[in-house]
Structures are given as C-alpha cells and as structure tokens.
Amino acid sequence: MANIVFKLSDKDITTLMSRITFDTENLPQGMKARAKYQNTTVNIYQSGKVMFQGNHAEAVSKELLPQHSQLNTNKTKKKNMANSFLEQTLMYDQFNCIGSDEAGSGDYFGPLTVCAAFVTKEHVPILKTLGVDDSKKLTDTKIVELAEQLVTFIPHSLLTLHNEKYNIQQAKGWTQVKMKAVLHNEAIKNVLEKIDSSQLDYIVIDQFAKREVYNHYALSDIPLPKKTKFETKGESKSLAIAVASIISRYAFVTYMDQISKNINMTIPKGAGAKVDVIAAKIIKKYGLSHLDTISKKHFKNREKAQKILKPL
C-alpha cells in the first residue's frame, strides 16, 4: 500500500475539500477531515498535512492536487535520506518491525508510559516524510503533532502505569526495570494480536536491561525470542522504536499537561531542583497525600520538597 504526504496551505486544503466529499465528524484527535475516493483514503490533519493511502494513492493525489508535483515529494525524501538519523535506521527499516519504548521513567511527576508499534517497510517513506525522528530531538509540540497522525495508521499498543498503581507496585518491591519489562512485553503481545505475525521480521526493544534481566522480570516469556533484538539508543536505529517513543512520549506529555491544569501550576519534567520547589508548593496547597497521587514516591524529590517546607 502506497502512502503519500503533502503539506498544504489553508487555501489548498479548502480547494481539496471542494473536490470530493469529506467526513468531518467523529474523527481521531488531530484529524480535520477524512474521505474515501477511488479505493484511496485521504486524511487531512490539523497540522496542514494531507495523507493519501492506498494502491492508487499517487494517481489520486495527482488528480486531486494537480498543482503539486510528486517530484517535490521525492526530492524531500532524498534530502531526508541524507541525514544521519535516517542513515542509521537503514538496517531495521528494510524489514517489518515491532518497536517498543517508554517515557516518564526519569520524571518525578507523571506516569510511566510504554508503547509498542508495528512499522512495515511500506510505512518507512511516509514516516520519513512526516519527520519522524528520535523523540529526544523533538519539541513537545512536534511530538503531539506527529503522534496524533501516527496513531491513525500505525498498529500500536499504548500502556500507562499511573502514579497510584506505580507506587503500589514499587512498595511491593518492583523496580523500574521490572515494571518496564512487564509493560513492554504486554504491549508487544497486544500488537501481535493486531497483525499477521507471519509478516513480522523483528521485534526491536529500546534496551533498558540486558536480555537475561528482561526475561527474568517480564513475568511472561518474550513472544518471539528468535526475532527479538535489544538495541541501545534504539530510537536512532529503528523507525519502529522512534514511532513507539513518540507515542509513549505523547501520552506522558498529555498527562503532564492535564496535571498542570488540575492543580493550576506548571509541572516541570525531570527530577531537578525546579521539581523540588513545585512539589513543596503542592504539599503546602494540597497536602502530601495529593502529591503522591501524581508522582513517584520513591524519588528523592519527595524528601527534598518536605525539607524545603520545614523552615516555613
């Protein structure tokens, strides 16, 4: 299945929407309109990007957007291929892969989120055109923009371990490594249920522990051990991991924004001194018990925040 993406102006989008009938209701977040035309799906996103999906995507795009040359898209792809990130991803991107990654493990506030995503060889050109990259290099705004598009066509499983459950498991003796191993394994199994596993070449996990440690903590066997690889700095080696990273980061960022709105304070990410100050303010205004519902209790920030309040 071919995938073609264009970045259009508001005027061009209006013109496109006048040419065929689009649905504008009950759409995924981040999508403006969707249409089915000549066995091709046309998705218009709030970001201004338009995606054509289907075996006739190129022909339909030329018909509906005659003013846009596919040559420009090809030039963009060649430029993207030249950058270092895409050169590094070449090995895994020649195969159909499930990638998995997590977000929030180093942050005092917010949950632990894990995503597994299935990226095929056919997905690779569109992901490069969209600008999928290592999430650590992307702003939160860009992560939200990308994730809201990715979830509409990439088979994936997103799991969130909220703070209250996280703290319960940690009190039982679960380390972060065990939590991540369990969540990664479950997310991968969930994706395998959504796809034809005979089409899968590799499962690539962004390595947070060696294989034997992962196996020890995962509670269940790795689904396809012979196809499973562990990669350090996996986001720079596999687009499947990069996609999983973006979606898991999106879930974490969205949750953090919601916490900030709920308590009317801007909640900082990470576990630095700014976090200590905000945690102290939350204790003073809402109490320690409320702080524990939105944070990871075993982090040193909790103790530091309490010390900040002692002189007051």
From Swiss-Prot:
Cited InterPro entries: RNase_HII/HIII, RNase_HII/HIII_dom, RNase_HIII, RNase_HIII_N, RNaseH-like_sf, RNaseH_sf, TBP_dom_sf
GO cellular component, one term: ribonuclease H2 complex
Domain RNase H type-2: 95-311
CDD domains: RNase_HII_bacteria_HIII_like, RNAse_HIII_N
Cofactor mode of binding and number, as noted: Manganese or magnesium. Binds 1 divalent metal ion per monomer in the absence of substrate. May bind a second metal ion after substrate binding.
Reactions listed under catalytic activity: Endonucleolytic cleavage to 5'-phosphomonoester
The organism's place on the tree of life at top rank: Bacteria
Gene Ontology biological process terms in this record: DNA replication, removal of RNA primer; mismatch repair
Subcellular location(s) per record: Cytoplasm
Residues noted as binding a divalent metal cation in the record, renumbered to the chain: 101-102, 206
Disulfide bonds: none
SUPFAM superfamilies with a match to the protein in the record: Ribonuclease H-like (SSF53098)
Xref: PROSITE patterns: RNASE_H_2
Stored Gene3D superfamilies: Ribonuclease H-like superfamily/Ribonuclease H (3.30.420.10), TATA-Binding Protein (3.30.310.10)
GO molecular function: magnesium ion binding; RNA binding; RNA-DNA hybrid ribonuclease activity
Cofactor dependency: Mn(2+); Mg(2+)
Keywords, comma-separated and alphabetical: Cytoplasm, Endonuclease, Hydrolase, Magnesium, Metal-binding, Nuclease
Entry similarity comment: Belongs to the RNase HII family. RnhC subfamily.
Known function: Endonuclease that specifically degrades the RNA of RNA-DNA hybrids.
The protein, known as: Ribonuclease HIII
Native source organism of the sequence: Staphylococcus aureus (strain MW2)
Lineage: Bacteria, Bacillati, Bacillota, Bacilli, Bacillales
